Amino acid sequence: MSEKKINLLDLDRKAMRALFADLGEKPFRADQLMKWIYHFGVSDFEEMTNINKVLRQKLAARCEIVAPEISSYQKSADGTIKFAIHVGEGQEVETVYIPEDDRATLCVSSQVGCALECTFCSTAQQGFNRNLTVSEIVGQIWRVSHFLGFAKDTGERPITNVVMMGMGEPLLNLANVIPAMDIMLDDFGFSLSKRRVTLSTSGVVPALDKLGDALDVALAVSIHAPNDELRDILVPVNKKYPLQEFLAGIRRYIAKSNANRGRVTVEYVMLDHINDSTEQAHELAQLMKDTPCKVNLIPFNPYPGSPYGRSSNSRIDRFSKVLMEYGLTVIVRKTRGDDIDAACGQLAGDIRDRTKRLAKKRMQENQISVTMN
């Protein structure tokens, strides 16, 4: 049996240079190769004209450059594109491209499904199968860049921002997320500014500390409730890492971060008559008083079977005004791609659920139905 080839999309620059040392080559050759892969989108070693033929042959014998394929895509009326990315075993994750006047953002997934069980999120209802590999994470960017068109003559890429806000909890896949983000930030990788790469987390505090020790990117935190009692229901990981513990971890992260410019982005989904009262707005402002932040209010995006409704514009406006009375910067997120189920909280993919979460939920619903009848 032939030896399995090394997928170069799995290697950050440190690992790539180690490979080249093993091949008896100088470190700058690894930098050249990364530039071909990430600046120009090249996957055929024979096209890498500044790498000598002998080395190209060595690489072809031991290595490959393989990104997951796009299975299908849908385009929204607002220009948002949702991609279904095939990751093997009949499974798909979803990646969303969001074009704007001054930027083009790609929302990237980190897990097949999600290991957490946030009750307002479609991904969480699908269950969880596994973590994505480095190549499956950066491969989403690489593949969508191909779809949009690498500028092979200049090396200019069509994606300016990446947000780790797709399917999954990134901090539960740090072993792959950190090298993937290293590649995003690397001058020889996707060459993105650390302020243009954002990781969103629901609050796995020990992993947040590890992230802070490893690299500096913009941080968004999923709060969604102003107290532990409600957050235990909406974001069950709160039972393990309650709000004050999470906020302390956030403060530790931004204290040593340049990417965040001294404050974090708080994400707060607006659920009708669940977490959107004026009293809860006052409570949220008090909660965040010692944690420098801006607040991103996210109108809830319904999905089939969701137990929640979207807050009315008047309730969102009233909530926002209360927060601003405390001097907080508040942004109401513009919903993008909801007509193709590509908006925040709507990503589902195609998952073989190892947790049996969806099956258990259906069983419980059937039991309730039988009892009521």
Swiss-Prot record:
Reaction catalysis annotation: adenosine(2503) in 23S rRNA + 2 reduced [2Fe-2S]-[ferredoxin] + 2 S-adenosyl-L-methionine = 2-methyladenosine(2503) in 23S rRNA + 5'-deoxyadenosine + L-methionine + 2 oxidized [2Fe-2S]-[ferredoxin] + S-adenosyl-L-homocysteine; adenosine(37) in tRNA + 2 reduced [2Fe-2S]-[ferredoxin] + 2 S-adenosyl-L-methionine = 2-methyladenosine(37) in tRNA + 5'-deoxyadenosine + L-methionine + 2 oxidized [2Fe-2S]-[ferredoxin] + S-adenosyl-L-homocysteine
One matching Pfam family: RlmN_N
Assigned EC number: 2.1.1.192
Keyword Transport listed: no
Keywords, alphabetical: 4Fe-4S, Cytoplasm, Disulfide bond, Iron, Iron-sulfur, Metal-binding, Methyltransferase, rRNA processing, S-adenosyl-L-methionine, Transferase, tRNA processing
Binding, [4Fe-4S] cluster: 114, 118, 121
Active site per database record: 94 (proton acceptor), 344 (s-methylcysteine intermediate)
Residues of the Radical SAM core domain: 100-339
Cofactor binding, note field: Binds 1 [4Fe-4S] cluster. The cluster is coordinated with 3 cysteines and an exchangeable S-adenosyl-L-methionine.
Binding-site list for S-adenosyl-L-methionine: 168-169, 200, 222-224, 301
Any single GO BP term: tRNA methylation
One GO MF term: tRNA (adenine(37)-C2)-methyltransferase activity
Location (main, coarse): cytoplasm
Enzyme class: transferase
One Gene Ontology cellular component annotation held by this UniProt entry: cytoplasm
Superkingdom of source: Bacteria
Disulfide bonds: 107-344
Names of required cofactors: [4Fe-4S] cluster
Locations listed in the record: Cytoplasm
Family to which this protein belongs: Belongs to the radical SAM superfamily. RlmN family.
Function: Specifically methylates position 2 of adenine 2503 in 23S rRNA and position 2 of adenine 37 in tRNAs. m2A2503 modification seems to play a crucial role in the proofreading step occurring at the peptidyl transferase center and thus would serve to optimize ribosomal fidelity.
Further details from the record: Reaction proceeds by a ping-pong mechanism involving intermediate methylation of a conserved cysteine residue.
Protein name: Dual-specificity RNA methyltransferase RlmN
Organism listed in the record: Shewanella sp. (strain MR-4)
Organism placement in taxonomy: Bacteria, Pseudomonadati, Pseudomonadota, Gammaproteobacteria, Alteromonadales
Gene name in the database record: rlmN
